[in-house]
Amino acid sequence: MKSFIEVAKPVVDSGIYMCAKFDQASCEALAQVQKLLGVENPVSAEKLHTTIVYSRKTVDLFPASGISEPARLVDVEKWDTKYGNTIVGVLESDYLHSRFNDAMDAGATYDFDNYKPHVTLAYDSRIEDISGVKRLLTLPVDLTIIKEDAESLDLDKTVEDITEHIEHRGESS
């Protein structure tokens, strides 16, 4: 069997981005969390994900499919990122830690001190104090990971590439 690198055959090593995707029920539960928090610029259901690998070096790790792995949303935090006030749901998941460790063992790079599994709920949210709205949530929220996707690392994604503004969601409320 060919390795991932043999299949992808990168000429210039742009790195690799791999993420875990959730089932429909999990995406609906996360959309409810977004709604309860009242976030602006929510990540759309089809773009909700958890980053596993964000490596400046391509590694030999195939994305998994046909899986059913549990994860739990256990907290919500505000992070200051290049996209503004980013609202993330902090996850507990042995599976995500295991896959991250697989990537690191395969030679992946990582720009942060620790791997903290999370799902981004909104970019440029304009929420300054998350503690006030966080109390509206009932945690934990059970989620199910059903597959992984991988692509070349793109360091120039815009907020429009990764979100869907609420006025485009088709919600009547």
From Swiss-Prot:
<keyword id="KW-0899">Viral immunoevasion</keyword>
<keyword id="KW-0945">Host-virus interaction</keyword>
<protein>
    <recommendedName>
        <fullName>Anti-CBASS protein Acb1</fullName>
    </recommendedName>
</protein>
<dbReference type="InterPro" id="IPR056175">
    <property type="entry name" value="Acb1-like_C"/>
</dbReference>
<feature type="active site">
    <location>
        <position position="120"/>
    </location>
</feature>
<dbReference type="InterPro" id="IPR009097">
    <property type="entry name" value="Cyclic_Pdiesterase"/>
</dbReference>
<comment type="function">
    <text>Counteracts the host CBASS antiviral defense system. Phosphodiesterase that enables metal-independent hydrolysis of the host cyclic di- and trinucleotide CBASS signals such as 3'3'-cGAMP, 3'3'cUA, and 3'3'3'-cAAA. Does not cleave cGG or cA4. Besides evasion of the CBASS system, might also enable evasion of the type III CRISPR systems that use cA3 signals.</text>
</comment>
<feature type="binding site">
    <location>
        <position position="17"/>
    </location>
    <ligand>
        <name>3',3'-cGAMP</name>
    </ligand>
</feature>
<keyword id="KW-1090">Inhibition of host innate immune response by virus</keyword>
<feature type="active site">
    <location>
        <position position="51"/>
    </location>
</feature>
<feature type="binding site" description="specific to adenosine">
    <location>
        <position position="151"/>
    </location>
    <ligand>
        <name>3',3'-cUAMP</name>
    </ligand>
</feature>
<dbReference type="Pfam" id="PF23474">
    <property type="entry name" value="Acb1"/>
</dbReference>
<dbReference type="GO" id="GO:0052170">
    <property type="term" value="P:symbiont-mediated suppression of host innate immune response"/>
</dbReference>
<comment type="similarity">
    <text>Belongs to the anti-CBASS protein Acb1 family.</text>
</comment>
<feature type="active site">
    <location>
        <position position="118"/>
    </location>
</feature>
<dbReference type="GO" id="GO:0016787">
    <property type="term" value="F:hydrolase activity"/>
</dbReference>
<feature type="binding site">
    <location>
        <position position="17"/>
    </location>
    <ligand>
        <name>3',3'-cUAMP</name>
    </ligand>
</feature>
<feature type="active site">
    <location>
        <position position="49"/>
    </location>
</feature>
<keyword id="KW-0378">Hydrolase</keyword>
<feature type="binding site" description="specific to adenosine">
    <location>
        <position position="151"/>
    </location>
    <ligand>
        <name>3',3'-cGAMP</name>
    </ligand>
</feature>
